[in-house]
Amino acid sequence: MAYQAGGERAAGVVRGAGTAMSGLLPISYDEEKVIGEALALQVLARYHGVYDKPQLTRYVNLVGRAVALTADRPTIAYHFAVLNHDSINAFAAPAGYVFITKGLLKQIRNEAELAAVLGHEITHISEKHVLAVLQRSKQLAGISEAGLSAAGHNPVVFKSLIDAVAKKLLDEGLDQGKELEADRLGVAFAARVGYDPQAYVGFLQRLRTLKGDDQAFFKTHPNFSSRIAETQQGIRALSPPRQGALLADRLTQRLRGQL
C-alpha cells in the first residue's frame, strides 16, 4: 500500500486525483485507489501498524470479503487488516481498505457481529462516503480550492493534502447521516450472506453499556441509542425477514490465542 508517485502514469493519476478532489471532475477508480492508499498509510501510522497475526488476518478477510460481495460495489478488491491498537475502532479508506483494531475484536462475541461491523465499513466504501467529503468540502482543514487544485500538479502538495484530510477524518469522523446509513446497510449486507442481523443490535447495546450513550466514537457520530433505533428499523425493512446464524463458536475458535 505504499504511496508512490514515480513514473508518468502514476504522476498522471495523482494529477487526476488532485483535480478530482477539487470538485471539478468525478473521481475515477484509479484516482480513488491513489487517495485510498495514501489515507490507508495514515491509518497504519496512527494506529501502530498491522497486527502481526496472519491466521487472524485471513479469518477477517474471509468474513469481510464474503460480506463485500453483497455490497453495491462488489468488484472492488477489498483488503481487511487488523490494527495493533487496543482502542475500540474501525476505519475505511476509499478503494477497499478496511481496518479493525484488535481492541474492537476483543469486544466481538460472534461472527455475525464481526460481519456487521465489517459491513458498516464496507458501506463507507461502497457508498463513497469519504470521497463525498473530499469533493464537497471546500476548506478541508483550512485548505483552499487553490490548494486542492495544486495537488493535481505537485505530489508533495498532494501528500500534504492527504495528511490534512486524514487528520480531519480520523479525529472527527463522518457525519451522522453517513454513519446511520452504514449501520443500516452494513447489517443488510451481512444478512444477505446469512448472518443474524440482530447480532449487531446486541453489539451496539454492549458498546453503549461500556462507553455510555453520549460517548460516540467521534463528536460528529450519532449516539448509540440513535444507532440502535436506526439499525432496528433497517432490520424490520429487510425482505424477506432474516434470522440467520451467529456462529459464536467459530469466532471463538478462530480468535483463540490470537488476541
Model regions: which residues?
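A Zn2+-metalloprotease active-site environment signal
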Residues: 1-259
